[in-house]
């Protein structure tokens, strides 16, 4: 009978296969960079970035992320318009809206355009990470990861 060396229960290539893939859509280069660094530090994979709603929708169709972080105020197509398109074409992908204008959008409108959560940018990125974890945990994350 052949002898097998004991190996890790999870091969090295798949140890982090649980990492949820996130698309960041924000017109601010620095904002995208900071959000991306923060999410990756928290254990998520940033699979792509876009600078406006039109580009973001194209990236979402191409990349099929697990979650989308979307800024409200952007050129060409704002976050509410992009969220509406995304919720229609990709309803299984949760959208988290980041904004400095939370009281302008309103919870009812956010729900109507398919946004799962609104995070005020002034609340800090810890709140964003907690929100992303709560939206992804049931489907994509093992209990001991969060």
Specify the residue positions occupied by each region the protein language model found:
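Non-catalytic signal-transmission and effector/linker regions of two-component phosphorelay proteins
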Residues: 1-21, 126-146
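Two-component/phosphorelay signaling modules centered on CheY-like receiver
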Residues: 29-48
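Acidic catalytic/metal-coordinating carboxylates
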Residues: 52-55, 78-82
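Conserved phosphotransfer cores of two-component systems
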Residues: 61-63, 85-92, 113
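Active-site beta3 strand of CheY-like receiver
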Residues: 63-69
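Receiver (REC) domain active-site loop signature in two-component systems and cognate sites
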Residues: 74
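Alpha4 helix (beta4-alpha4-beta5 surface) of REC/receiver domains from two-component response regulators
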Residues: 81, 102-130, 134
């Amino acid at each position: 009978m052949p002898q097998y060396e004991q190996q890790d229960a999870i091969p090295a290539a798949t140890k982090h296969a649980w990492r949820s893939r996130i698309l960041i859509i924000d017109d601010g280069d620095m904002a995208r960079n900071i959000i991306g660094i923060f999410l990756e530090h928290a254990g998520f994979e940033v699979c792509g970035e876009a600078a406006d709603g039109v580009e973001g929708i194209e990236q979402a169709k191409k990349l099929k992320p697990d979650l989308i972080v979307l800024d409200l105020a952007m050129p060409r197509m704002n976050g509410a318009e992009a969220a509406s398109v995304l919720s229609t074409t990709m309803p299984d992908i949760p959208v988290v809206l980041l904004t400095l204008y939370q009281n302008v959008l309103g919870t009812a409108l956010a729900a109507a355009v398919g946004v799962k959560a609104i995070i005020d940018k002034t609340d800090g990125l810890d709140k964003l990470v907690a929100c992303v974890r709560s939206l992804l945990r049931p489907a994509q994350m093992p209990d001991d990861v969060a």
